Amino acid sequence: MENATRIVFLGAGNIAGPYAESIARHPELSLVGVFDVDADKAQHLAESHGFAAFADLDELAAASPDIVVNLTSAPYHFQTTKELIGRGLTVFSEKPLALEPEEAAELVEAAAASGTRLACAPSLWLGAAQQAAAEEVLSGRIGRVGLVKAEVNQGRIETWHPAPGSFYKVGPVVDAGVYPITYTTAVLGPIREVTAFSSMTVPERIMTTGETFTPGRDDTWVVSAAFESGALLALTCNFFVGSKTQPRTVTFHGDDGSVVLDDWLLPGAGVRAAEYGEPLTELHAADDSSPLDWSLGVLELAAAIRDGRPHRTSAEHARHVVDVLDAVALSAFDGRRVRVRSSFPSPFKAVGATA
């Protein structure tokens, strides 16, 4: 497509392939190259998808990308994003924006000072099902939301993933709880207070190779949070219960009814709604043929640049999510309530009342 948004990757790890496949489905995006400190990884990805492998960051920047997608490992997000911003480049970062609240705040300030755009995953809340549920909540048809319940059941990753260590190093809240936390705050606004409990349910894990390891973080978490709006969130996150046993749902309960998103991950998930006291009825039909689209946030950022409007996957929102994740850890480890003070502009006001 003529005038397609030029995309480059920083990082060629496991998630880079799915990102490349998703971007290829959108002609308005053009993936032109990748740089990774592991040159072999970068070359393999480039050859597999038909774009360039850059020798270093200078060569990446010289390609004049419209957006750099930062797919480095989480511990490197802060430093690499900071360097990209320093080069005047627009960045879409994989989640989380940073591992520490102070680092996330520094990135937000750096982007604002340099006049560059900074966006961040997760962006799967921009999917069709997630937007349908959000639209129903924001329409006011279920009234004031008082309670949200969310389930993150990621199962025992070591039973299928060849290298599960990175998941267990950060734990289920940072790895996957970030999805419903990002989604519910996008819909309802900032969280102001958090309490959390955690435990090590399975202290010894057995990999597909037969090797054993001990998770670096507790594998089961129960989180309670209070939104600024007054609504409460009940969130469970674990690497213990499988999603086929207990679905990955998000349910909004309001004064006048409820909305159920059957899966916070899948764009083709079903959405059901009901007036108070009535049975749930289908609002958005499930579509198992809808693939995960990892490029939704990149697509949104590109569209916002073209339209001259704020992007919905804002750095301010991502910073708030980092603050919430930090509050969850502090609460569980210190046994106390933890306040969250950061705020962010509503992502739905960026393009109107709803997506």
Predicted ranges, named:
Residues M1-A4, N14, A24, E59, ...:
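C-terminal helix-rich "cap/oligomerization" subdomain common to oxidoreductases
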Residues M1-H49:
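N-terminal Rossmann-like dinucleotide-binding module
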Residues V37, D287-V298:
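Active-site loop of classical SDR/Rossmann-like NAD(P)-dependent oxidoreductases
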Residues A52-A63:
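Short acidic low-complexity segments
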Residues A55, N70, S93, L118-C120, ...:
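Hydrophobic residues in well-ordered beta-strands that form the structural core
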Residues A62, D66-I67, S73-A74, F78-W125, ...:
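Beta-strand-loop-alpha-helix segment that lines the small-molecule cofactor/substrate pocket
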Residues L124-T214, G335:
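Predominantly a Rossmann-like dinucleotide-binding segment in NAD(P)-dependent oxidoreductases
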Residues T182-P267, S295-R309, S343-A355:
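Contiguous beta-strand/loop segments that form the cofactor/metal-binding neighborhood of enzyme cores
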